[in-house]
Amino acid sequence: MESGVRILSLLILLHNSLASESEESRLIKHLFTSYDQKARPSKGLDDVVPVTLKLTLTNLIDLNEKEETLTTNVWVQIAWNDDRLVWNVTDYGGIGFVPVPHDIMWLPDIVLENNIDGNFEVAYYANVLVYNTGYIYWLPPAIFRSTCNIEITYFPFDWQNCSLVFRSKTYSANEIDLQLVTDDETGLPFDQVDIDREAFTENGEWAIMHRPARKILNPKYSKEDLRYQEIVFNLIIQRKPLFYIINIIVPCVLISFLVVLVYFLPAKAGGQKCTVSISVLLAQTVFLFLIAQMVPETSLSVPLIGKYLMFVMFVSTLIVLSCVIVLNVSLRSPSTHNLSTKVKHMLLEVLPQFLHLRVEPCDEGEETPRERRRSSLGIMLKAEEYVLKKPRSELMFERQRERHGMRREPDGYRADGFDVGVTTTLYRNLAQCAPEIKDCVDACNFITQNTKEQNRTGSEMENWILIGKVLDVLCFWVALPLFVLGTLAIFLMGHFNTAPEHPF
């Protein structure tokens, strides 16, 4: 009994499906028996067929700045009315709409005008829905690669305005009227790109700020021209700069800051200073090359990060130049340059006070630590002179009597055992009688004068080294504010470059 009921139920379902299929087939046969897909759905030649468009964005795939190409995944909704495709629902089993293949229908030939790959049509030709009232609804999906003029002035803090331009490639404004779809809630044209919230995938690099849509009539063309009317869908997108900040800007700023630290090296280490500065300069050149690979090859504008790299390269070049000058100053000597009093006063007295730098210049009349070390030579020479003038026997038995408790010399005697007057007379007689001793005295005087000259030369060379140190500090306090203020000024321009509040 149960098996019979099941068989009966299956037969009823099969009959209903066959009846429904036959009704749909009969309807399609009825509609398209005398249908001419090449003819416009208009009653007269002068009638204009309204065609509505709507764009639904499901994914902003990519914006290639180098190729100036926008890749999007969209659904293109196209609708119009065809009075030839009208039927009574009750005559065909209550069928209110029927899907039909696109190749047997009249289509308005709406294409993406600003495509980049020569593919003007959609990616997949879906079936067309035909309603009993003559309303035609077509929703084909597409992956469009369209052109987008890239403005790189504020890269990577930029925003772009990319557009998708649709027009008919067959019919002029006298034959079809392109319109935006009407919003069911407001009754006004839906003047923006729709976003499918369930299927939409957020892009990791770009944020959609505005998505307006509008119809544009080009008055410089006539209505017979296909370029007279077009529907433009705009995508105003703002770049998310975090990737570029972490991977390009921060390393570039840190490496560029190293060039300022060369002033902490000794003034005489000019070779190391130039090596560090030129190394940083080469690193900045590498960053500039990386930026050139990301942006389009255009001479209309320079990207913001490119401006910054040019700025720090200019500062680095100035620092290398200053290091060369400081090295030249630090290695000067009295034989090549004369240190004037005005220069010494300005660079070793006035300028250090302005820089809050403690500098003690070396004067010729003052005895520096180096001079004190050199003066020991004179003491040794005097000691040798004293030893040479005394007989060895006197040196051996000097103060012998005092050690054995005998009387001391009178107050008129010096500690070395000679009477002052007798010693003077003895020296005078020795000078007259011994030319060799006079030559020794002259040699000692020559050594003394030479030592003083060396001390004067050394003092002046130390002053040149101090001047180099002062110039290093001065250049540091000039380069550091220049670097910091230039960095802030350039990147703040990009920070305040945001998409407009209103698209138009």
Curated annotation (Swiss-Prot):
Reactions catalysed according to its record: K(+)(in) = K(+)(out); Na(+)(in) = Na(+)(out)
Ranges per topology, Extracellular: 20-240, 293-307, 498-504
Topological category with respect to the lipid bilayer: Multi-pass membrane protein
Membrane-crossing segments per the record: 241-265, 274-292, 308-329, 474-497
GO terms of biological process kind: acetylcholine receptor signaling pathway; chemical synaptic transmission; membrane depolarization; monoatomic ion transmembrane transport
Membrane topology (Cytoplasmic): 266-273, 330-473
Keywords: Cell membrane, Disulfide bond, Glycoprotein, Ion channel, Ion transport, Ligand-gated ion channel, Membrane, Postsynaptic cell membrane, Receptor, Signal, Synapse, Transmembrane, Transmembrane helix, Transport
SUPFAM superfamilies reported for this sequence: Neurotransmitter-gated ion-channel transmembrane pore (SSF90112), Nicotinic receptor ligand binding domain-like (SSF63712)
Disulfide pattern: C148-C162
Gene3D superfamilies referenced in this protein's UniProt entry, alphabetically: Neurotransmitter-gated ion-channel ligand-binding domain, Neurotransmitter-gated ion-channel transmembrane domain
Entry GO CC: acetylcholine-gated channel complex; neuron projection; plasma membrane; postsynaptic membrane; synapse
GO MF, any single term: acetylcholine receptor activity
Range of residues in the leader sequence: 1-19
Record-linked InterPro entries: Neur_chan_lig-bd (IPR006202), Neur_chan_lig-bd_sf (IPR036734), Neur_channel (IPR006201), Neuro-gated_channel_TM_sf (IPR036719), Neuro_actylchol_rec (IPR038050), Neurotrans-gated_channel_TM (IPR006029), Neurotransmitter_ion_chnl_CS (IPR018000), Nicotinic_acetylcholine_rcpt (IPR002394)
Glycosylation sites noted in the Swiss-Prot or TrEMBL record: N88, N161
Subcellular location: Postsynaptic cell membrane; Cell membrane
One Pfam entry name: Neur_chan_LBD
Entry's family note: Belongs to the ligand-gated ion channel (TC 1.A.9) family. Acetylcholine receptor (TC 1.A.9.1) subfamily. Epsilon/CHRNE sub-subfamily.
Cited function: After binding acetylcholine, the AChR responds by an extensive change in conformation that affects all subunits and leads to opening of an ion-conducting channel across the plasma membrane.
Subunit structure: Pentamer of two alpha chains, and one each of the beta, delta, and gamma (in immature muscle) or epsilon (in mature muscle) chains.
Protein name: Acetylcholine receptor subunit epsilon
